[in-house]
């Protein structure tokens, strides 16, 4: 492994004694290792008992089943309004809201669906993220009202006969993102050869190619642009499907409910399982939702600048020099997130002593864990449970940092930050180094 673009340090956890290092004071791009810093800051300031909260309100009289007034949804940055914790049922929460309305005797809403997403600002994507990738799932927009990770899937079905146009349907159903399908139906045998794209700035997903005349297929997740509109349209569509038609319009407005509003439902989700999604599965959308929530709770508005300011306070508060941590977002998608291996190790040692350190470490990926980004690494019986940490991968960057227990029982902290390297060669180098440490440390 060449020396340029490389920063490594391995130290004893208890003493801080460095046993191996290369360019350890040299800052490198850290990719998703960034998520360790944002999740630790969120846990530090929000606490392990924190809950995200989204509320549904109604206003007006109910007569003969009709609400002569509007509905209001107030967003709190919750990334979990999806099927992730509900057996993949992305309609689960909306269906509960429909039940709450029906229990109030409502079967139709005459007024508008008002959406308050003012908890965050309206900068939905970080300006330092790669351009031209806005339709990729990992660049889903960040909003105080978000639904289904702000992505859609396209289900592609064959037509009735070979040669007929295939059928493309968007899930979740909404009136914002539409499918335009030119794909044709092929024979029974063969594999689908389909291109699914959403041009930048467009709400139309194009589907082209050929699908076999059997079964159906789903695309990879496709990020949407208008998070608030997607939330509102999906909710309106689901309420209609649940027998609650909405007569008015979707309106985005920062209304705070007063005594004229009646609370219909409160949806809450817990911080710690959310942090586990970030650190185990490296879900960038989750990381940025939490990062802006931290900013909104502490400084009154969910912005990246506020979140980065809070993060500096956190680093200083745990005894670290914040000027040594050049961080630009909460997920690591910005290539400008640069930290030296020695400073990552110092952070890991500080978190081991943190009052919430054990809870935070439990959110990290574990070698061989099928639910984490380390599921294909350190799977051998002798490595089981030995490696706990965070992976990072963007173009030309492969990083790994965390804690490892050697055969001797001694625990080490490590940061292996590789830039200008391919993913597979980076993983191979990191894994060899960690395995050597386990055997000889």
Descriptions of predicted regions:
Residues 22-28, 221-222, 331-334:
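A short glycine/serine-rich beta->alpha loop
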Residues 19-21, 92, 281, 291-441:
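Small-residue-rich helix-loop
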Residues 1-14, 18-27, 53, 100-105:
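Beta-lactamase-like hydrolase cores
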Residues 5-8, 275, 287, 312, ...:
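Short glycine-rich loop/turn motifs
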Residues 45-322, 439-440:
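Conserved serine DD-peptidase/penicillin-binding transpeptidase domain
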Residues 21-41:
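Short active-site loop at a secondary-structure junction
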Residues 26, 79, 418-422:
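A generic structural motif
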Residues 16, 35-42, 113, 145, ...:
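Residue-level preference for non-acidic, small/hydrophobic
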